[in-house]
Amino acid sequence: MLLSLLVIIPFLSGIFSFFSFRFQKNIPRWIALTGMGLTLLTVIRIWFFEDYYTYQIQSYTHLSYQLILPWISSFGIQFHIAVDGFSIVMLFLTLFLGIIAILCSWNEIKKNEGFFYLNIMLVLMGTIGVFIAFDLFLFFFFWEIILIPMYFLISLWNQKKEDKKKCINIANKFFIYTQISGLIMLASILLLVLNYYINNKILTFNYDLLLIQPVDKSIEYIIMLGFFLAFIIKMPIVPFHGWLADFHERSPYCGAVDIIGALLKTAPYGLLRYNKMLFPNATEQFAPIAIFLGFLSMFYGAWVAFSQVNIKRLIAYSSISHMGLMLIAIYGGNEISFQGLIIQILSNSISTSALFILSGQIYKYLKTQDISEMGGLWTNIYWIPGFSLFFALSNLGIPGTGNFIGEFLILFGIFKEHPLVSIISTIGIIFSSIYSLNMIQKIYYGLSKHDFPKFFLNIKEFWISIVLIFALIFLGLIPQKILNISFESIHFIYNFSKRIQ
């Protein structure tokens, strides 16, 4: 029953937020925040008191804490949700940044507050569902349900209100990209289910059953490629990145926190959970191509980020660059790099979200996202420059932060398998220092281009920034706390993915 609360609470919180707006416009945000808090307490309850570590590898039953209810029995579809250490970590990230996103929007949303928080809660519910669904139809359901509320967030609460038509066009682009991703995934899931039916005469979407059924080599590569394309479009990886920068440029900052912090991380989760485990042979054959795409994203994202004049687009392209490293970790590394990937997902999500939050404060102060209009702000703005410098340095992997630990483990794990790949990846990481420090120099140093009054960081954003700083330092100094949670899951995923047939 506890597991079902992970999706029930956000859903009901969104519904209550929507209807409560009719009574008092401040009620929806309190309901949304309470819903996130209760969901987080539920995850903590599962983490402390339930046994999700037990693995029975001999029978391939790797999940001990799960809920299975009949749903569409005639097609073998169940409401099957479960957690392991990997899921627990991703749930903590989603809920932590979900609370941050709600707090960031606290006084920023001036219209349709009830509908806004409904969409935020549906995005978070869908993201949570992706991390706990172990029926492939249910996984697809949650994967797709995120699309609709994200469409409304960009089209109705865009950052630049004067250009409504362009925002709708950008929302349409996002819709098309993600819809293509969903259709490819659905076709691949159906082929996988058909393969199981041909061999066992049973229709099922159960992940555990599909996991132990070898896929015919004649179609394994095709199905794997379908899953891969669906995930890298959402990640996104070059050349399927066209929607991300436009989306972030026009999205509300709380929406950017959601999508960068949690939503994009559903893709590397899916690659590890599904591609690596369901299609070991095809994944092994495809690894060189995936690594090449990772390199392409790393270097392209870094170079384009360096040339950006819009602060939100710069941060978006930096995210693409980091996603390239994550893809290389998945396809070119080992168990060590997988553990590094977990830390990198957490740290990159936090540092990038923090940069978005601070850029929102700069926009509130200057009414522009154009870096060329900035300069010399260090003496005009209190706290923001120092915080921005910390998060920029964290993003490029300064020691003492979680980003450093994640990158170190990833590169160390890759080096054991492919030394040359690790060396090239290191060069790619160096480029992140160029665009990060260039951004800081252009915004906060040099001569001021305008006569700006003194500006103080909002007290709410100040404490949010402090919390995010402590989170990154915690991951940098005590990463073992997280690695212990995810170890059993990652160990199982790595060993199971090595069963080359």
From Swiss-Prot:
Catalytic activity: a quinone + NADH + 5 H(+)(in) = a quinol + NAD(+) + 4 H(+)(out)
Keywords: Cell membrane, Membrane, NAD, Quinone, Translocase, Transmembrane, Transmembrane helix
A GO BP annotation: ATP synthesis coupled electron transport
Membrane topology, from the record: Multi-pass membrane protein
MF terms (GO), sorted A to Z: NADH dehydrogenase (ubiquinone) activity; ubiquinone binding
GO CC field: plasma membrane
Enzyme class, broadest EC rank: translocase
Keyword Nucleotide-binding: no
Pfam families: Proton_antipo_M
Localization terms from the record: Cell membrane
EC number: 7.1.1.-
Transmembrane segments: 1-21, 30-50, 86-106, 115-134, 139-156, 174-194, 222-242, 252-272, 286-306, 314-331, 341-363, 374-394, 420-440, 459-479
Assembly information from the UniProt record: Composed of 13 different subunits. Subunits NuoA, H, J, K, L, M, N constitute the membrane sector of the complex.
Protein family: Belongs to the complex I subunit 4 family.
Role of this protein: NDH-1 shuttles electrons from NADH, via FMN and iron-sulfur (Fe-S) centers, to quinones in the respiratory chain. Couples the redox reaction to proton translocation (for every two electrons transferred, four hydrogen ions are translocated across the cytoplasmic membrane), and thus conserves the redox energy in a proton gradient.
Name recorded for this polypeptide: NADH-quinone oxidoreductase subunit M
Annotated gene: nuoM
